[in-house]
Design a protein with these regions (language model features):
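Two-component/phosphorelay signaling modules centered on CheY-like receiver
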Residues: 10-35
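Acidic, metal-coordinating helix/loop segments flanking the phosphotransfer/catalytic sites
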Residues: 33-56, 66
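Conserved phosphotransfer microenvironments
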Residues: 54-81
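A short, hydrophobic beta-strand element within the central beta-sheet of small alpha/beta folds
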Residues: 77-103, 114
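Short, flexible helix-to-coil linker/hinge segments that flank and couple to helix-turn-helix
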Residues: 107, 111-113, 118-155
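Residues within the DNA-recognition helix of helix-turn-helix
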Residues: 128, 191-194
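Helix-turn-helix DNA-binding segment
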Residues: 148-189
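Basic, Lys/Arg-enriched C-terminal extension of HTH/homeodomain DNA-binding domains
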Residues: 196-216
Length: 216
């Protein structure tokens, strides 16, 4: 079993090797460890030159990127890996807790597994890797709860609406958001009204409320 572990904290490498060795005692293991996206891409390309592939990859989202390849973080790296090695099992390991970010990771990357680090103990990782290898999808409890909460609001499940909220939280003006999304200001305001109605909040509390709920 050829395993890629990509994380900018090298201290996690040995524990994760142990998790895999425990989960798959009857397999031979070959580990490749990298601390940034550039190293990861180089290892993926090296494997391809040998007509080989990774069987399993653990990827942290918050890693230094590789600008030359337009890969800015672990999320972009996961997309790249999915394109280059579609049969490789992917497991996203992250400290991110924001609802929107986790929702987008699940929807856009469709990893075989995704976990918030604070949810997981050693036995949880071992069980997760076993399930994923058997073809199951794994999500840790926080991921499940936050994704389900977004699905509970049809308005928030819309990607454009989530982008609008994120832009507002980052201080964008309505005109700037309209330009960014190539929509009219009237359309943006209508969407904001729907968002407020769905969340049962008013004009003065929208940003405070979405931050309080952990959406952004």
């Amino acid at each position: 079993m050829k395993i890629l572990i990509a994380d900018d904290h090298a201290s996690i490498f040995e524990p994760f090797k142990f998790f895999f060795e425990t989960a798959f005692k009857n397999k031979k293991h070959s580990f490749t460890t990298v601390i940034n996206c550039k190293e990861a891409v180089n290892e993926i390309e090296r494997k391809k030159l040998k007509n080989s592939t990774f069987d399993f990859a653990v990827i942290d989202i918050s890693m230094p990127g590789y600008a030359e390849k337009d890969i800015h973080n672990g999320s972009d790296l996961c997309k790249y890996l999915n394109q280059e090695m579609p049969n490789c099992k992917t497991f996203i390991n992250t400290a991110i807790l924001e609802n929107f970010t986790l929702f987008d990771l699940v929807q856009n990357l469709k990893p075989d597994g995704i976990a918030v680090k604070s949810d997981m103990k050693a036995e949880d990782y071992i069980a997760a890797f076993e399930k994923i290898w058997q073809g199951e999808i794994f999500r840790s409890s926080s991921v499940d709860n936050k994704v389900n909460e977004i699905w509970g609001y049809e308005t928030l499940a819309n990607e454009t609406n989530r982008t609008i909220i994120t832009c507002l939280a980052n201080g964008y003006k309505i005109k700037e958001i309209a330009n960014e999304l190539q929509l009219t200001e009237v359309s943006i305001n209508k969407r904001i009204s729907k968002i407020k109605k769905a969340l049962e909040i008013n004009e003065t509390t929208i940003l405070r409320e979405v931050k309080r709920r952990g959406y952004v």
